[in-house]
Amino acid sequence: MNERMVDQSMHSEETDFELSLRPTRLRQYIGQNSIKSNLEVFIKAAKLRHEPLDHVLLFGPPGLGKTTLSNIIANEMEVNIRTVSGPSLERPGDLAAILSGLQPGDVLFIDEIHRLSSVVEEVLYPAMEDFFLDIIIGKGDEARSIRIDLPPFTLVGATTRAGSLTGPLRDRFGVHLRLEYYNESDLKEIIIRTAEVLGTGIDEESAIELAKRSRGTPRVANRLLKRVRDFQQVNEDEQIYIETTKHALGLLQVDQHGLDYIDHKMMNCIIKQYNGGPVGLDTIAVTIGEERITIEDVYEPFLIQKGFLERTPRGRKATPLAYEHFAKSNEERG
């Protein structure tokens, strides 16, 4: 799958850029106000008791700040953080090596925790509950169990698929926090802050326009801002103006709802070739040349959230709003 401007997942070249933009304290974190308020209380209470924070599960769509929040938690607790991904923990020994290296109160952040293997997950249970590991060494008749005591720590797990977590793992998290899509006001504030970090001026209209087209996701907002800045610098403008912003977003094929060429391709397929549906997901996948799982996990959620697409027992169906928007878009494109 080609990388899209509106893809909510991180592009390979964006790691350093995102790191430079991440806030380090809760007071700097824009949006997710309910989560911030709760975390402030939980962190303050844990510090008053001189205990590590309860294990935290962060879940929601990609690009909303789960990794950023995990680092903020460590900073607010004044402890170190160790970051790993679920798929990288292939064997119990991988987990044991990391956990045994933690200091009291440290944070272990496991991204994509829903992708932990069942073997590693079972070893994690006593570590989360009672802070010890039971590791089997040797094979057959020579196999023996070794208990490793661990310092109290906080596990922060992040997932885009909370429903894929097993019940026993999910229940061991004391704090469950769902990150929601950002409103346009918060995205506008994020865009203005990012422009300051980049050393680029931006007018308010441009910040509002970018916020509208960012799919409720800071990662998308920052990516679009970077590309619009390219046009501004080539034009040798003193700052980013609305005319440049609209021109750039038009060339990038990101419309006023944050939909791109793939969204248009998929919806036009349903509307034009299959009379608006219902049409099966496999049929759509073959018609537009994309994998079923990519359509289901990447393209569909935002179209459904915006009210353009319905999932029915008989297949996918375009809504009246989709007919209105995509017919108008097709007319504008000629």
Swiss-Prot record:
The keyword Hydrolase applies. Residues 256-334 are annotated as: Head domain (RuvB-H). Its EC number is 3.6.4.-. Keywords: ATP-binding, Cytoplasm, DNA damage, DNA recombination, DNA repair, DNA-binding, Hydrolase, Nucleotide-binding. ATP binds at residues 21-22, 63, 66-68, 129-131, 172, 182, 219. Pfam families: AAA_lid_4, RuvB_C, RuvB_N. InterPro entries: AAA+_ATPase, AAA_lid_4, DNA_helicase_Holl-junc_RuvB, P-loop_NTPase, RuvB-like_N, RuvB_C, WH-like_DNA-bd_sf, WH_DNA-bd_sf. SUPFAM superfamilies: P-loop containing nucleoside triphosphate hydrolases, Winged helix' DNA-binding domain. Belongs to the RuvB family. This is Holliday junction branch migration complex subunit RuvB. It comes from Staphylococcus aureus (strain JH9).
